[in-house]
């Protein structure tokens, strides 16, 4: 691991919530998608196809509002601990752009920043691309002849006890909506399925270092296993599947897809599914469109009952976890992890956490948020 700064908690001037971004009105949709796909030669027709998903919801991605809710919760947790650390919000692809947020932080006198990237996972898209955002942000400040920021990015949190406990809680609540009171006694017609964003197989193979194996999918399987263990779900009564693949179909992505999986389960006699979007901390467009719209429509056609578990980013426990990740990165708290798969991503000033970790590969884009 590359060296990290030896800060104390009093050295942290601010926390930055760094995210993907999303449109907040019909007029934002195409400009946002153009930002997401800049330099990739994506035809306008394809952007219009994706835009339909946003326009169905008034051109609004739920992501920005949910991130603001996370920020409000972080501020409350900090206040409850007597900490007066400001929390800022910056996006890669839409307002508030992280470069603009960086300028504001500098004007406010901020120098040392703890950066929380809104992804639990390793891989290029889930981790290293946020390092690149930090590098570009400081280059922007240099071009503006402003002081650069010292940025400590927090680690991946897929196996943090508070994340696993909160995921377990929402899965249990979703099961109760189907009348299931004991997840350790699921019947043959009942299953729990955990979903995460599909990525190209080559991107999965290049997540982490070579010796880590495919880090992204290993982390997703580990997190699902930890939740299942917490709830007493037997290995035969839960699965991990993927969703929201994009591209032209010529490049293999992680499978099975949630829609194909639901059809197969129906054919095997399963009529009730508890669906837990463990790969998403908030109700991204992938969740509200792909699960609440497409999957529910399919389930209705098949006569299946689907109960979708809530995402956990809006909870007080999630905000507490973020503050604990800050404390952990400074040595104030011990490293808290329940699993054995590596949890990486803690880095300084955009340098990768390890040499040759999560190297980028050319891949189709996902334009949703």
From Swiss-Prot:
The enzyme's E.C. designation: 4.99.1.9
S-S bonds: none
Keywords: Cytoplasm, Heme biosynthesis, Iron, Lyase, Metal-binding, Porphyrin biosynthesis
Binding, Fe(2+): 197, 286
Residues given in the record as Fe-coproporphyrin III binding sites: 61, 130
Pathway the protein takes part in: Porphyrin-containing compound metabolism; protoheme biosynthesis
Reaction catalysed by this enzyme: Fe-coproporphyrin III + 2 H(+) = coproporphyrin III + Fe(2+)
Gene Ontology molecular function: any one: ferrochelatase activity
GO cellular component terms given for this protein: cytoplasm
Localization per Swiss-Prot or TrEMBL: Cytoplasm
GO biological process: heme biosynthetic process
Domain of life the protein comes from: Bacteria
Function comment: Involved in coproporphyrin-dependent heme b biosynthesis. Catalyzes the insertion of ferrous iron into coproporphyrin III to form Fe-coproporphyrin III.
Family: Belongs to the ferrochelatase family.
PANTHER family: FERROCHELATASE, FERROCHELATASE, MITOCHONDRIAL
Protein name (database record): Coproporphyrin III ferrochelatase
Native source species: Corynebacterium diphtheriae (strain ATCC 700971 / NCTC 13129 / Biotype gravis)
